[in-house]
């Protein structure tokens, strides 16, 4: 056995606006100590999800998955079709399946190269000059995989008439994002929404989205835990635009799917130790242990991920502490794969609502960015549990079945000191000692689907259809509302004069938001010929939403209904590497509210139509195997049936009459510019405004930047001193000015964040170590 370590990652956040490489020497970098026991290339296991297609395309996909080159004569594989290959197996096992019935065999020329040759039969082809289809080891590649699980099928992204962005595993390892917002900075058209004091993931895509809106998935199933990004995440996928056909009730911006690390039959063990500092005595430490491998020779494999973080908060007080335990078990049969995973997380995080807008200037208060306006007890403390089960079975070469079940729960208590008013003449604030106790969020999701292909009238139909069932409940038992003991000076702040709130407000407690839904969906990709693909489908969904608050409880939403959501698209494969597409998609989301609507006793029921969105998109996708993947898209989204308040005398009447629109341009590029250079970059122009509303017509949508972009590049020096490896990278992201509220009376300023990292691989006593 040969022992080596798997790559780790280092990332230092140096400033919200600038970074210099000289500062890297002053800040401790993360130290990754890793050791991995590896089999030979012939024994290493890979996860394959390759659809049946022309053999040259299949070989290109094979090289991308394995990082191994396939060489052949110019004419050898052409005119042949490779069968579908799915499941976990070695590169040689997969290639043998791809070559079934082709009259070709292969031999290994070195650890990274396989050569095709004719089987020893009469009339066999003679191999002449070779063509190299891939030369790069995929382990460091910034190029996304050809397929994406967010599409709920094994279809190539070149055949999908909608934007799909993937943040590859190596980008995650290099950048070491602390949360989902950091990871999504690599994707065009995404800004951060209301994170509830930095305690929730809140993603706004193409101008739409919020926290707790059901758009964040783990392995294709929804989660309700506040923060989903952790040491178990391998890569992140984003499906842009309305996604109700695949995911039911959604905002029209899209969905985000975090793909977890899975058990592998190939042994791997890594220990990572981290240290960090913000200066001024604010330090942190942490570590991660990641272990996977086979359990005997029965096809069983395990994975265990342990992670702990304990660090001082970057502002003037606070502690961030979290512990993660995530075991998983998989069984790989000949045609069946089973997966069970569990994740337990305990956390303590500052509940920090940031600064305040000065009403005299409509800009943030002129105080230090380190100064908090709350109290040291302003924290959220809780735990989350996630159970996940999947079963996949290949019925034959053309059809496979999938079953998935997920149960997610998060509980927490939080103190939330809120600013209720400001006196700029005295430089003081009035605050409320608020909080939430015994909050419980739960989501249960079950899905079953079939994917396969049939030929009708000489045309191939790629079908996926299934059923989904979901129950989601967000419940906050006790809401604390307590007046402060004194005013607070933001000019000369003094902390510790207040006590943590304990007065429960019966009228605000028992906050409940409950959703039940059942649906069936179908999608058909019709290959009209070798270049044109027509995609069409729909979802029929029944839903029941119930929400309200108070002791005694008062329902403010009691709505149920049915909805049919269609989707259609057309793809033109100009070449194997370049495709063009156009699509029409829809989404819907029931109108609901926990609190009573202002000035009204209206209960939202079935008479209030759900929000509905329609989107048109035109785009092009470039995919050069072993090099880069790019996507450019033009989109136009209109969402109607937005709740509108209309005053009729002393009464406020609410109706679903409003409309908002978002349109724009997006560009994404990721992959290998050369053997040394890797990059990932994006740009988005988003024009989002209210188009129908008696008060807000013409106003920009809140928190949506017209211009945003990011660019990160990495240079791999290769072998330096004694065979050691050196990689360095840097990047920046920009978010333009955004409307600060619905009435647009102030703007949030633009900002730029720059980052850098460096990794150095060496050997210590035969074990590979990465700094």
For the regions a protein language model found, what residue spans apply to each?
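N-terminal export/assembly leaders
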Residues: 29-124
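Acidic, small-polar-rich N-terminal luminal/periplasmic segments of exported/outer-membrane proteins
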Residues: 64, 69, 86, 128-266, ...
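Outer-membrane beta-barrel translocator/receptor signature
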Residues: 232-234, 245-327, 331-337, 385, ...
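Acidic/polar loop-and-plug regions of large Gram-negative outer-membrane beta-barrel proteins
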Residues: 309-313, 326-394, 407-441, 484-513, ...
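Structural signature of Gram-negative outer-membrane beta-barrels, strongest in the C-terminal barrel
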Residues: 326, 330-332, 441, 460-472, ...
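Face-selective signature of the C-terminal outer-membrane beta-barrel domain
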Residues: 387-410, 433-548
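Membrane-embedded beta-barrel scaffold of Gram-negative outer-membrane proteins
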Residues: 390-406, 410-418, 580-581, 609-672, ...
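Gram-negative outer-membrane beta-barrel transporters
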Residues: 529-531, 636-638, 655-741
């Amino acid at each position: 056995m040969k022992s080596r370590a798997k790559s780790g990652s280092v990332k230092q956040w140096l400033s919200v606006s600038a970074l210099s490489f000289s500062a890297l020497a002053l800040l401790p970098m993360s130290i990754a100590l890793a050791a991995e026991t590896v089999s030979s290339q012939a024994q290493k296991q890979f996860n394959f999800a390759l659809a049946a297609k022309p053999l040259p395309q299949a070989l290109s996909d094979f090289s991308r998955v394995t990082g191994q080159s396939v060489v052949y004569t110019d004419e050898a594989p052409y005119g042949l079709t490779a069968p579908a290959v799915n499941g976990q197996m070695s590169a040689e096992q997969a290639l043998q399946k791809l070559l079934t019935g082709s009259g070709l065999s292969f031999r290994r020329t070195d650890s990274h190269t396989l050569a095709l040759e004719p089987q020893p039969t009469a009339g066999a082809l003679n191999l002449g000059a070779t063509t190299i289809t891939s030369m790069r080891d995929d382990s460091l590649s910034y190029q996304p995989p050809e397929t994406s699980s967010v599409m709920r099928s094994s279809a190539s992204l070149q055949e999908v008439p909608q934007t799909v962005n993937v943040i590859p595993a190596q980008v995650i390892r290099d950048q070491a994002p602390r949360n989902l917002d950091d990871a999504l900075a690599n994707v065009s058209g995404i800004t951060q929404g209301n994170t509830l004091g930095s305690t929730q993931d809140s993603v706004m895509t193409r101008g739409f989205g919020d926290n707790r809106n059901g758009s964040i998935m783990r392995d294709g199933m929804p989660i309700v835990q506040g923060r989903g990004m952790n040491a178990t995440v391998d890569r992140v996928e984003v499906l842009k635009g309305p996604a109700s056909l695949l995911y039911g009730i959604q905002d029209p911006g899209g969905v985000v799917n975090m793909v977890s690390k899975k058990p592998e039959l190939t042994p791997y063990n890594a220990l990572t130790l981290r240290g960090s500092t913000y200066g001024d005595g604010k330090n942190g430490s942490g570590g991660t242990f990641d272990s996977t491998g086979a359990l005997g020779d029965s096809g069983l494999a395990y994975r265990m991920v342990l992670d702990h973080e304990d660090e001082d908060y970057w502002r003037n007080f606070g502690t961030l502490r979290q512990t993660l335990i995530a075991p998983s078990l998989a069984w790989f049969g000949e045609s069946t794969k089973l997966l069970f995973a569990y994740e337990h997380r305990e956390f303590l995080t500052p509940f920090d609502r940031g600064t305040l807008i000065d009403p005299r200037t409509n800009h943030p208060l002129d105080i230090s960015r380190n100064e908090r306006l709350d109290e040291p007890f302003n924290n959220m403390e809780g735990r989350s549990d996630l159970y996940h089960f999947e079963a996949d079975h290949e019925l034959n070469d053309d059809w496979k079945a999938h079953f998935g079940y997920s149960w997610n729960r998060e509980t927490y208590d939080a103190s939330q000191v809120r600013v209720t008013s400001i006196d700029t003449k005295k430089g003081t604030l009035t605050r409320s000692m608020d909080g939430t106790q015994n909050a419980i969020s739960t989501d249960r999701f079950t899905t079953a689907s079939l994917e396969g292909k049939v030929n009708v009238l000489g045309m191939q139909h790629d079908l996926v259809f299934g059923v989904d069932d979901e129950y989601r409940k967000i419940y906050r038992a006790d809401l604390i509302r307590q007046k402060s003991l004194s005013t607070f000076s933001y000019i000369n702040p003094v902390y510790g004069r207040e006590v943590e709130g304990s007065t429960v407000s019966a009228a605000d407690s028992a906050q409940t938001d409950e959703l039940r839904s059942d649906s069936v969906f179908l999608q058909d990709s019709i290959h009209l010929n070798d270049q044109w693909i027509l995609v069409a489908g729909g979802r029929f969904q029944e839903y029941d939403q119930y929400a309200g608050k108070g002791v005694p409880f008062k329902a403010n939403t009691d709505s149920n209904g049915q909805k049919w959501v269609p989707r259609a698209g057309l793809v033109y494969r100009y070449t194997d590497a370049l495709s063009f597409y156009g699509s029409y998609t829809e989404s819907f989301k029931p109108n609901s509210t926990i609190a009573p609507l202002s000035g009204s006793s209206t209960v939202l029921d079935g008479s209030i139509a759900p929000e509905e969105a329609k989107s048109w998109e035109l785009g092009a996708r470039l995919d050069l195997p072993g090099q880069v993947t790019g996507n450019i898209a033009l989109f136009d989204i209109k969402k109607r049936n937005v709740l509108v308040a209309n005053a009729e005398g002393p009464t406020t009447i609410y109706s679903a009459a409003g409309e908002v629109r978002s349109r724009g341009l997006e560009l994404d590029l990721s992959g290998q510019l050369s053997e040394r250079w890797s990059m990932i970059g994006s740009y988005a122009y988003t024009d989002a405004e209210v188009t129908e509303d008696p008060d807000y017509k013409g106003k920009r949508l809140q928190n949506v930047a017209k211009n945003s972009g990011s660019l990160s590049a990495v240079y791999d020096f290769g072998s330096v001193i004694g065979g050691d490896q050196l990689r360095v990278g840097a990047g920046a992201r920009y978010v333009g000015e955004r409307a600060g509220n619905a009435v647009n009376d102030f703007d949030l300023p633009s900002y730029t964040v720059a980052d850098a990292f460096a990794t150095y691989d060496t050997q210590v006593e035969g074990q590979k170590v990465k700094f």
